Amino acid sequence: AGKLSLHDPVSKYIPEMAKVEYLTGDSPTINIENLLTMTAGFPEDNPWGDRQLHEPDEMLIGLIDQGVSFSNAPSYKFEYSNTGYALLGNIVSRVSGMPYQQYIKTNILQPLGMDNTYWEYDNVPAAELAIGYRWEDEQWTLEPMLHDGAYGAMGGLLTSIEDFSKYVRFHLSAWPPRSDADTGPVKRSSLREMQTPKFPRLYAKAKDSNGDPCAVMSGYGYGLGIAENCNGRKGISHGGALPGFGSNYIFYPEYGIGIMAFGNRTYTGPLPSREIEKLLFETAELKTRELPVSDILAERQEQVLRMLQTWDVALEKEIVAENLYLDESRGQRMTHAQEVFEKAGEIQKVEALVSENQLRGTFKVQAVNGSIDVYFTLTPEKTPKVQDLRFRF
């Protein structure tokens, strides 16, 4: 850990990369982040890359040494590249002094308790090994297994749903940001960085699971796809496939859940996951998990409610930011509050605060004649004060 920077040129670790001829004369040098985000300019290579899984490091470095073809200039746009991730695996091996497979096993898989996860199918207990198939000539045909090699860094793990759920759970544990002990094996802030899209793209004509128009913003982080649909629901996912197999997983940080599906047919699609999503979000109407309420937000909630009822000058001096009465006069706010609380009638219950973040939230005041919705947000000062306050009956 800490032995490289994402902005280091790849040639610092793989000298053969210094000789590559870029597509354009103004191309920037490929760095490690380019490989992670699929923006190195390499062409999409899924069909070809799958068949390179077993090849040794010498083949990978020979490919670079002989010269590679580019489809784009680096840092210009996203294009999926298995070769880029094979190079990342090679860098991990060189920097760590051990095969990337061993480094990942020791530093990621074992700490997560993923003891039933393998790189090489020969090491999987025979009774547990899933056999791959393809559909050909109207019948199922066995697909020969591929051995592990240099290209395994693109996604050559063999695992179970139970084991892989530990990995997905680890990603979900990064949310929300908090001050709890950070036990690793990767820092929560680093996981959230992995889940942040680069080069986001708008799919304006996208449709939802029912075929209705629903635009999607989509991008790629560090080995993860991130998409947010027209309903504001963000999913972080990746699919993968090799001859004989297919997999798909997605997790929703704001909901605290993950969905995964594995299949032993060549390029199995994500349909099972999509059906589960429909059940959760449309049928069950799953709600987002609530953010914890900060101490200052909880304190200001009680004070805001008291101010709206009493307009105590001393209290206002304590909690009102300098802009609040400049944006709308104290007199206007007082008159509006009196009208709202008179219409609502006697207060019966104040509901729990729902926080948008550590300095902004909403709550409902239940009264005899209905409810009052209250929204407020606090300043960035050391002692945060109320800079915006809205309420309606």
PLM-predicted stretches and their roles:
Residues S237, N248-F251, Y255-R265, D373-Y375, ...:
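Short, well-ordered beta-strand elements
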Residues E282-T288, E381-F393:
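A short, surface-exposed interaction/processing loop segment used at functional sites
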Residues F199, A206-D208, R233, A261-Q332:
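Short, gly/Ser/Thr-rich active-site loops of penicillin-recognizing serine hydrolases
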Residues S5-L23, L112:
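Short, glycine/proline-biased beta-turn/loop segments that scaffold the active-site neighborhood
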Residues P243-G246, G370-I372:
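Short, small/polar residue-rich loop motifs at catalytic or cofactor-binding pockets
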Residues A1-V10, L88-S93, G256:
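Active-site SXXK
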Residues Y22-I236, A241:
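Short, surface-exposed loop or secondary-structure junction motifs
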Residues A215, T335-E381, V386-D388:
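Surface-exposed, charged secondary-structure patches
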